[in-house]
Amino acid sequence: MELNVKTLEGKDAGKVSLSDEIFGLEPREDILARVIRWQLAKKQQGTHKAKGRAEVSRTGAKMYKQKGTGRARHHSARAPQFRGGGKAHGPVVRSHEHDLPKKVRALGLRHALSAKIKADDVIVIDNLVAAEAKTKALASAFETLGLTNALFIGGAELDGNFKLAAQNIPNIDVLPIQGINVYDIVRRGKLVLSKAAVEALEERFK
C-alpha cells in the first residue's frame, strides 16, 4: 500500500510504500490487550504493603481468660477481626511483571500499526526537524495538520529542537524508533511517522 508523505508545513512530499505484512494485518484486539496488559504490569510499582498479624506492634498476650467470661474464646489481639489487628491476606511488596513471548510482543506492534492504518490515523512526515525550539511555531504547524492528540515517531536520533518544542504541547508524545510501543500507539489519536521511522520498521520486520 502507499501513503502520501507530507512536510510539517502540510505540503505534499511524494509517496511512501508500506508493507502489508506490517501495516496490512486484520487487527486482533486480544493480541493488543495482552501486550498492553504486559506493558502496564511492567510499569506498576508494586510498593504496596499492609502489615499482617505477625508484623503489627501489639501484645501477644491472651486477651482474657479462656473460661468463665461467657465471651468468645480469643487469644491474640493481633488477629485481623480486631481493630488495630493485622490485615488478613493484605498486599505485599512484589513485582507485577509477567512474561510475554517475544513473538507475541512483535505481533502486537504490527497489529497496533495495522489498526491505525485501518482507522486512517497514520500520517507520514518527510522529516521531524524544527528550525528552532519554539513551541508556538510547532503548535501552529500541528494545528495546520489537524494534530491535537498524536504520537510522533522519529528515526534513531531525534532532532533536539523538535523534541524541545514538542514536549510542552499537551497530548503530544515524541519517541525515537527504538521507543515505539503498542500502549503509546493505542492511547494517542494519530500516529505520525517520519520516513526514517518507516524505513526502520520495514528493516526490523523484514
UniProtKB/Swiss-Prot annotation:
Can you supply one Gene Ontology CC term for this chain's record? ribonucleoprotein complex
In its UniProt entry, the species of origin is given as Rhizobium etli (strain ATCC 51251 / DSM 11541 / JCM 21823 / NBRC 15573 / CFN 42)
Query: Could you confirm whether the keyword DNA-binding appears in this record?
Result: no
Any single Pfam family the record assigns to this protein: Ribosomal_L4
The gene that this protein is the product of is: rplD
* The protein's name: Large ribosomal subunit protein uL4
Among the GO biological process terms of this entry, one is: translation
Report the domain of life of the source organism: Bacteria
Region entry Disordered, spans:
63-97
In this chain, composition skew of type Basic residues spans 64-77
